[in-house]
Amino acid sequence: MSKLIKGIAASDGVAIAKAYLLVEPDLTFDKNEKVTDVEGEVAKFNSAIEASKVELTKIRNNAEVQLGADKAAIFDAHLLVLDDPELIQPIQDKIKNENANAATALTDVTTQFVTIFESMDNEYMKERAADIRDVSKRVLSHILGVELPNPSMIDESVVIVGNDLTPSDTAQLNKEFVQGFATNIGGRTSHSAIMSRSLEIPAIVGTKSITQEVKQGDMIIVDGLNGDVIVNPTEDELIAYQDKRERYFADKKELQKLRDADTVTVDGVHAELAANIGTPNDLPGVIENGAQGIGLYRTEFLYMGRDQMPTEEEQFEAYKEVLEAMDGKRVVVRTLDIGGDKELSYLNLPEEMNPFLGYRAIRLCLAQQDIFRPQLRALLRASVYGKLNIMFPMVATINEFREAKAILLEEKENLKNEGHDISDDIELGIMVEIPATAALADVFAKEVDFFSIGTNDLIQYTLAADRMSERVSYLYQPYNPSILRLVKQVIEASHKEGKWTGMCGEMAGDETAIPLLLGLGLDEFSMSATSILKARRQINGLSKNEMTELANRAVDCATQEEVIELVNNYVK
């Protein structure tokens, strides 16, 4: 008899294969064992660190090839952990001062760090706790001489089942053999979920108990479309899901026909579908999926996973590569958005009680112009290689925009005096992420060339709900009428001044939100490249006039639930 296990759909698709249980290695040891050869034990620890660096470097290089530089940056962060004296020194001191064995010293110190980071109300710090756990496990395995599971050695078709997949586990998956995976823990924003989407393999996370309910070699089905795992399916279920898998692949193939098609509603209104990227490595997916431009180029990945700032020349080459590849299509580059959930080890940013509302993004750049000016110079120099738009993140006041623009114009003049060619067709815009900015959209619209609505932050700031907090996640409501009204206000303000508005948050590629955004008059929808063709098909089947009527009714609703019901009744 088959068994159904529910989880969170993390990556689309249907996988059918035997279960491969990722068995946790035995990393037990005697915590109370004292050592007499202290120097030898420190050397043993140092040797484990060096061996871990060698392994992680190989994994990092493989991840860059398979997943792109932005995903590989996770392992750059792991390598930095192994070089962090604030972590390494206390471990060595514990061995020397307490005669602790290397395994005990490592786990005691890293557990303290993990506990501190996990208690912080900060997404970046919580992710760093996971990084430290992953790195600590690898170092411990070398201390104990125990081999960690290596998914890259799998040589038959399987679905991986485990408690969780670490970033290094996921980076070693071979798409040829690993058909999908299912885990006990995790969410849609966990490292493993993000990487599964990059690898385009079906994945389900957060099942709570799958490792207790599946045995090695069980036949299982992973339905990444609905979040279902079927263990030991019946013959009828097997046939049904094989059919569902074939239909899924047929649908993907059918969508490819829309790659070069226009995005136009049934009543003739055009929309622009653009892609979000982190590095030039993301360009193949952008082109394969028929993006009409890049609506968000996150430049912070150029700064992450390294121990010093990128030079102006390094930045220039990265921006030039993207602009040339897009061949005249619009590329919207967001200036450095560091702080909040993204930090740089070499900047030594002050700790803050609430970093999401603190020293970050444009605030940091205006205060530290030695960071800001080289980026602006690199962008201006690259502008002659394509259609460049520049936008500033986290702008709260018109004076911030004016100051940023003044610095850019100053650097433009400097570059011209140095003999550089600069495009005269660069549009300057801002991210609308703060409710105050949306409220003054009419004021901003007189001075900016465009808006890009960053819904991820706009939603959590408007509803005062941390989207990473399970206790208040019910308040993170993309379809709340308050959000729709702010979006409408921003779009109308831009159109009144003859300007345009895009959206680059997750909402832009959401199938429930798309009809509403189309009706509200959104000009550009920027999303993950893999969502573009589905969004194009959806928009090409909608009527702009009908969606305008829908949106007008939606902003008058009282709750998110009413909005969802309204959309479901309109769009069937």
Curated annotation (Swiss-Prot):
Gene Ontology molecular function: any one: kinase activity
Major subcellular site: cytoplasm
Residue sites binding phosphoenolpyruvate per the record: R298, R334, N456, D457, R467
EC assignment: 2.7.3.9
Cofactor: Mg(2+)
Binding sites annotated in the UniProt record for Mg(2+): E433, D457
InterPro entries membership: PEP-util_enz_mobile_dom, PEP-utilizing_PTS_enzyme, PEP_util_AS, PEP_util_C, PEP_util_CS, Phosphohistidine_dom_sf, PTS_EI, PTS_EI-like
Lineage: superkingdom: Bacteria
Subcellular location: Cytoplasm
GO biological process, one term: phosphoenolpyruvate-dependent sugar phosphotransferase system
GO cellular component: a single term: cytoplasm
A Pfam family: PEP-utilizers
Reaction(s) catalysed by this chain's protein: L-histidyl-[protein] + phosphoenolpyruvate = N(pros)-phospho-L-histidyl-[protein] + pyruvate
Keywords: Cytoplasm, Kinase, Magnesium, Metal-binding, Phosphotransferase system, Sugar transport, Transferase, Transport
Residues at the catalytic site: H191, C504
Miscellaneous field: The reaction takes place in three steps, mediated by a phosphocarrier histidine residue located on the surface of the central domain. The two first partial reactions are catalyzed at an active site located on the N-terminal domain, and the third partial reaction is catalyzed at an active site located on the C-terminal domain. For catalytic turnover, the central domain swivels from the concave surface of the N-terminal domain to that of the C-terminal domain.
Family indicated by similarity: Belongs to the PEP-utilizing enzyme family.
Subunit structure: Homodimer.
Domain notes: The N-terminal domain contains the HPr binding site, the central domain the pyrophosphate/phosphate carrier histidine, and the C-terminal domain the pyruvate binding site.
Entry function: General (non sugar-specific) component of the phosphoenolpyruvate-dependent sugar phosphotransferase system (sugar PTS). This major carbohydrate active-transport system catalyzes the phosphorylation of incoming sugar substrates concomitantly with their translocation across the cell membrane. Enzyme I transfers the phosphoryl group from phosphoenolpyruvate (PEP) to the phosphoryl carrier protein (HPr).
Protein name: Phosphoenolpyruvate-protein phosphotransferase
Organism: Staphylococcus aureus (strain MSSA476)
Organism lineage: Bacteria, Bacillati, Bacillota, Bacilli, Bacillales
